[in-house]
């Protein structure tokens, strides 16, 4: 990374906000660092230290193969996250230094990501005939029905009592995705009804221009959120299941709106949770997956071309090892000093899917680099069982995104990418 880029990142990260904001961010970071030395954290502290050393010395060696072993480890970690919760959902993640007071390191269940984890686990179960994994996914789907809001929406943030719930379009779309998969698997009318209520709420939430109005309380306000177009894929899927064209047309309208935010160089505006000037690869991945999957399903070559335009601008920033910076400015200069591992996995998924459609191996080759790098960051052996099989939020783990822990969605997308890589190896 160029010195000028590093200076730009430091300036925007530490000197652009108010002094108060910088102070509280630094205080929270130091509290997490101090927590590493709390009793019982020796094993996790060792994981953090080894990761920092590997990052500082560029000592990560990508791993080829081992897909089945690593996919199984990822699934087992997700199931441990479900077992840690009393309700059937999956814990938001494993954060030993900041678990919200739970004491176990595992946070409470998270409806949004439990939703799309259902799809991943059912795909894994189908590929290997694993009924136990499928049963676990269905318990998640039933729990999601139990906590669905009366309006048909899904709450934003970790699960909370009904009186504290606030609706969020993105979260609703991700749970709709899980319900679509659960209905295809089970044929349960109760799940179909929940999915319909969610799909109807999402369609009604679109404004005249095709953007979702209800972003929820956990993201920055006062702007559209381009990445919410991933909901369109779930809406389109429901349209295919129900046989009703109006859902498909609403999904297409949502993607067309998102593409109005794409710049000539492929970068998307208004495309982050909190920093639209420098979106995460995580939210870039959400946007690209939504655009691509609806494009493939609807036969819209212009959607596919838009995804190609972004990838062709973004992928040259990936190192030969598979390391990818976690944020990007509008000129495609890196905007972060750490990697957002969820985003790397998501972009690998998009690359595999695009390669399969276009028949261009260069996209699959890029995906392989991303996935093989992530494999090297997945621990298969640790004295802390909460770390085994998981993918961290950032590399290093003290990096900017979901610091000091393992959000469940990082491991979910890693699992999806592993399954796509394995499918490619079989062809």
Regions found by a protein language model. Name each.
Residues 1-427:
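Glycan-recognition and catalytic cores of secretory/periplasmic carbohydrate-active enzymes
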